Amino acid sequence: MSDELTPSQSHVIPEGYSLLNWHRGFGRQIGPLYEHNGPTEYRRAFLVEEHHTNGMMNARGGMIMTFADMAWGHAVSTSDSLWWVTVRMTCDFLSSARLGEWVEGSGEVVLQQDDLYTVRGRIWCGDRTIMTGTGIFKVIEQRPIAARPSLNKVSNHGG
């Protein structure tokens, strides 16, 4: 048995999304993950696949929380490309994400004090909110140019 990701994944990525180039470490274990960067907003996303699910074929709560950490924390690094760590997350589960559903998430910085950022976030499938919450993230340093996500993306639409 291999833990390599396969094109199961023969699903269609929604317009505007790019595959995140996270092919090793923890990103590989939970992926594939995607992002959409618009002029005034960003979103991260994933398709619920079997390796994300529990016995009820819903995305495990731990997967949703991990995804929230990545989606909400990204709000800290969107303009300054900063490395950050999670200090605290408070999450409210409101619904489940089922096998085969496209899950999206984003966050908004609502407070910054020194190197601490408070982010309010939401995770959803279509019109259904899966989770809301708040994260506190601590900036640890500026990312080196080679480690900045925008330079390592693989585009779905030739861009």
Regions found by a protein language model. Give the residues of each.
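Terminal targeting signals and extreme-terminal segments of soluble enzymes
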Residues: 1-159
